[in-house]
Amino acid sequence: MFKMIFLILSLYSYANANSYKDMFEKDIEIKKVDKIYASTPTILYSLYAIDKSKIAGLNFPFNKVEAIYIDETIKSLPIIGGWFGKGNTPNSEMILKINPDVILLSETSKNQSEKRIRDSLGNINIPFFYIKANSIEDIINSFSYLGKLTSNEKRAKELENYAKKVLDEAKELSKKVKEKPRVYYAQGNNGLETECDKSIRSELITLASGDNVHKCQNSNTYGKELINFEKVLSYNPEIILVYEKEFYKKVYSDPKWQFIDAVKNKKVYFLPKGPFSWFDRPPSFMKILGLKWLLNILHSNSYEIDINKDAKEFYSLFLGLELSNIELNHIMGKDIE
C-alpha cells in the first residue's frame, strides 16, 4: 500500500519537471533537486565536494580517519547502503522513507541491470541519473553534470578547471619522460596484494609516468591480486607505494624486504588518506591531489612543487578545510615515519 501511494504521488510531482542530461546523454525529468541519494561512495564524495547540502543519505558510516574531516550534519544522515563493491545493495525501505528527488547511479549499475534495481525499489518513479566515475577523467567530467543538477555550476567549473590543469600537467610531463621508474603498489598487511598495470585502481601510476611492475589483467573487478614475495623480489621495484599503515610500519625492519631497491634507498611511501584516499579504495576526486603528489615523488627534478602548500590549497578548495601542519602530517603518514 505504501509503495502504491508513493508511486501515485511521484507521478503527480513529475508532471512539471525540469530536464537534465546524465553522462550517457539520456534526458532525465526532475521537478526539483533538494535531496539526492548517491548510490556509490565515489559519486557521494563528488557530490559532497560540490554541494553537500543536497545529500540525503550515506552508503556506510564514515570510519575514524574519514569522520575527522567530515561535516557534522553529514555524519548524522541515515545509512542507506548502495550498489557498489562485492554485491552490496541498499535498504530499499530506507530509500522510500527519505524520498530522494533523484538517485545517482554508477556506470557499473547501468551495465548490470537497471530493471533489477527498479524491481528492488518496487518500480517507484524516482529518476535515475547515471554518472561515470571509474577513472579520474570520468570523475573530473562528472563535476559539470553534478554542478548543473545541484544548480552549482560555477563551483563545479572551478573544481573542474583545477583538476584538468593537474591532468594536463601530467600529460605534458609524460612527453618528456625517457625512463619510467619501476613502481610496486603494496596492499594488505603483508604488502602482498597489488593491482595489475591495466587496472583502473592503479591508473595514477600510469598517469604519473611510472611503470607498474605487475603486468596482467585483473582476475576480478574488485582487484587486490595476490602475489608472493619472490615475485616482488624479481620485480625489484625502485618505488613502493603502501596502502596500509601496518605494512608501512614494518617494511624497513623486515629482513627479506631489505633486498629490494626501494627499501634499500628509502623509497617506500605511505599513500595519504583523509578523509579519503589520495590514490584508491575508494576512488574519489582526491586522486587529483594524489596525482600531483605522485608526480612529485616519481619526477621530483621535473615536477617541483611544495606538496604541503598544494595539499592545503586543495583541501580548502574541495573540502572547505583549513589544515594545520599536524593534520597534514597525519594524513600523509609522516607521523609514522
Regions found by a protein language model. Give the residues of each.
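Structured C-terminal subdomain patch of bacterial secreted/periplasmic proteins
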Residues: 135-148, 248-337
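Ligand-binding pocket segment of bilobal, Venus flytrap-like solute-binding proteins
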Residues: 204, 214-215, 222-247
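Short helix-initiation/N-cap motifs at beta->coil->alpha
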Residues: 23, 79-93, 218-229
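A short, structured surface patch at a secondary-structure boundary
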Residues: 43-97, 102-109, 210-213
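Alpha-helical, coiled-coil/dimerization segments enriched in small aliphatic residues
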Residues: 84-85, 194-223
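Classical Sec-dependent N-terminal signal peptides that target proteins to the secretory pathway
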Residues: 1-17
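Extracytoplasmic ligand-binding site segments that recognize negatively charged/polar headgroups
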Residues: 65-66, 86-87, 107-116, 131-145, ...
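Bacterial Sec-exported substrate-binding components of ABC uptake systems
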Residues: 14-46, 153-186, 297, 302-337
